[in-house]
Amino acid sequence: MKYGIVLFPSKKLQDIANSYRKRYDPNYALIPPHLTLRTPFEVSEDEISGVVRHLRELSKELKPVTLKITKFSSFAPVNNVIYMKAEPTEELMQLHEKMYSGVLEDKPEYAFVPHVTVAQKLSDDEHSDVLGTLKMRDASHEEVIDRFHLLYQLDNGSWTVYETFILGA
């Protein structure tokens, strides 16, 4: 089964992200706005209990993280994804690194750029127009997130929470 590990921001930030995602993100209905801590990975049913145990231990060691959204940005020209950029704080970077340790040990596929996606799979022209508009808006937002979530993917492609882990508990 395919799993992923994410932070879900507050409803306030999710509402802001969704106001764009409804129109510009074809994955809008598959998963709420989130910050990916670990890209999707395959784990068998036999192995998932070990993963959950490992994540429980990690959650006790780690503290809640401050999420500071600073601006709208893009991964162009690599791809036409537009996102709300999160400041790569030490605590957020550490949380990401821990998601690739222990039974989950692996090398991340990409450098970690903490973000919340608001638009993807846009044409070049649409990407340019949307990004130009969003860059003029104030994206400043700060909040503390005290939990992360292990998600799994359903047959229809949507993601749902398998387990939630409280940071520092």
Swiss-Prot record:
In which domain of life is the source organism classified?
Bacteria
Q: Which Pfam families did the record assign? A: 2_5_RNA_ligase2
Q: Where is the active site?
A: 34 (proton donor), 115 (proton acceptor)
Q: What class of enzyme is it?
A: hydrolase
Q: Where is this motif: HXTX 2?
A: 115-118
Provide the E.C. number(s) assigned to this enzyme: 3.1.-.-
> What keywords appear on the UniProt entry?
Hydrolase
Q: Where does the signal sequence lie?
A: none
Which residue numbers does the motif HXTX 1 cover? 34-37
One MF term in GO for this entry? hydrolase activity, acting on ester bonds
NCBIfam families to which the protein is assigned, alphabetical: PRK13679.1
The UniProt family comment states:
Belongs to the 2H phosphoesterase superfamily. YjcG family.
Which PANTHER family does the annotation name?
Answer: PHOSPHOESTERASE SAOUHSC_00951-RELATED, PHOSPHOESTERASE YJCG-RELATED
In its UniProt entry, what is this protein called?
A: Putative phosphoesterase BLi01284/BL02661
Q: Native species of this protein?
A: Bacillus licheniformis (strain ATCC 14580 / DSM 13 / JCM 2505 / CCUG 7422 / NBRC 12200 / NCIMB 9375 / NCTC 10341 / NRRL NRS-1264 / Gibson 46)
